Amino acid sequence: MLNQIIINKLNDQINLEFYSSNVYLQMSAWCSKHGYEGAATFLLRHADEELEHMQKLFNYVSETSGMPILGKIDAPKHDYSSLREVFEITLEHEKLVTSKINELVEVTFESKDYSTFNFLQWYVAEQHEEEKLFSGIIDRFNLVGEDGKGLFFIDRELATLE
């Protein structure tokens, strides 16, 4: 059985994952509107992935006799100046999620809740992969630039990335 402090933190993370899905879904819509179909597809997949992260946390709280509580989810930003801005914001958002996961891991360790600590290790590894992925996308912008050909190349490659 989880203590209430950990339940509250897990619920905060559930809601952050839900918000993350909405952020990527909205970014996908912006990309689609501006002709970046590869980026739109990529971000749509990531929106679905964030929902899976949320559901995994939701189920864990339920399975451990806690009560998952869905809070108010703010509307994400919906207008961007460029495709690069979309992915710069995405990288910063993933860094925020990483910091929140790390805080949660720290609380579970200090509380000697080793079961939840162990459960969260999947998220620790996942966040490492997410930051690496989005840093790599920014590296592509730096490498090929943002002219028409560069954007075409990046958009086409995004369609193939997981």
Swiss-Prot record:
<dbReference type="Pfam" id="PF00210">
    <property type="entry name" value="Ferritin"/>
</dbReference>
<feature type="binding site">
    <location>
        <position position="50"/>
    </location>
    <ligand>
        <name>Fe cation 2</name>
    </ligand>
</feature>
<dbReference type="InterPro" id="IPR012347">
    <property type="entry name" value="Ferritin-like"/>
</dbReference>
<feature type="binding site">
    <location>
        <position position="17"/>
    </location>
    <ligand>
        <name>Fe cation 1</name>
    </ligand>
</feature>
<feature type="binding site">
    <location>
        <position position="127"/>
    </location>
    <ligand>
        <name>Fe cation 2</name>
    </ligand>
</feature>
<protein>
    <recommendedName>
        <fullName>Probable bacterial non-heme ferritin</fullName>
        <ecNumber>1.16.3.2</ecNumber>
    </recommendedName>
</protein>
<dbReference type="GO" id="GO:0005829">
    <property type="term" value="C:cytosol"/>
</dbReference>
<dbReference type="GO" id="GO:0006879">
    <property type="term" value="P:intracellular iron ion homeostasis"/>
</dbReference>
<dbReference type="InterPro" id="IPR008331">
    <property type="entry name" value="Ferritin_DPS_dom"/>
</dbReference>
<dbReference type="InterPro" id="IPR001519">
    <property type="entry name" value="Ferritin"/>
</dbReference>
<keyword id="KW-0479">Metal-binding</keyword>
<keyword id="KW-0963">Cytoplasm</keyword>
<dbReference type="InterPro" id="IPR041719">
    <property type="entry name" value="Ferritin_prok"/>
</dbReference>
<feature type="binding site">
    <location>
        <position position="50"/>
    </location>
    <ligand>
        <name>Fe cation 1</name>
    </ligand>
</feature>
<feature type="domain" description="Ferritin-like diiron">
    <location>
        <begin position="1"/>
        <end position="145"/>
    </location>
</feature>
<dbReference type="GO" id="GO:0006826">
    <property type="term" value="P:iron ion transport"/>
</dbReference>
<dbReference type="GO" id="GO:0008198">
    <property type="term" value="F:ferrous iron binding"/>
</dbReference>
<keyword id="KW-0408">Iron</keyword>
<dbReference type="GO" id="GO:0008199">
    <property type="term" value="F:ferric iron binding"/>
</dbReference>
<keyword id="KW-0560">Oxidoreductase</keyword>
<comment type="function">
    <text>Iron-storage protein.</text>
</comment>
<dbReference type="InterPro" id="IPR009040">
    <property type="entry name" value="Ferritin-like_diiron"/>
</dbReference>
<dbReference type="GO" id="GO:0005737">
    <property type="term" value="C:cytoplasm"/>
</dbReference>
<comment type="similarity">
    <text>Belongs to the ferritin family. Prokaryotic subfamily.</text>
</comment>
<dbReference type="GO" id="GO:0004322">
    <property type="term" value="F:ferroxidase activity"/>
</dbReference>
<keyword id="KW-0409">Iron storage</keyword>
<dbReference type="InterPro" id="IPR009078">
    <property type="entry name" value="Ferritin-like_SF"/>
</dbReference>
<feature type="binding site">
    <location>
        <position position="94"/>
    </location>
    <ligand>
        <name>Fe cation 2</name>
    </ligand>
</feature>
<comment type="subunit">
    <text>Homooligomer of 24 subunits that assemble into a spherical protein shell (12 +/- 1 nM diameter) that can sequester at least 2000 iron atoms.</text>
</comment>
<feature type="binding site">
    <location>
        <position position="53"/>
    </location>
    <ligand>
        <name>Fe cation 1</name>
    </ligand>
</feature>
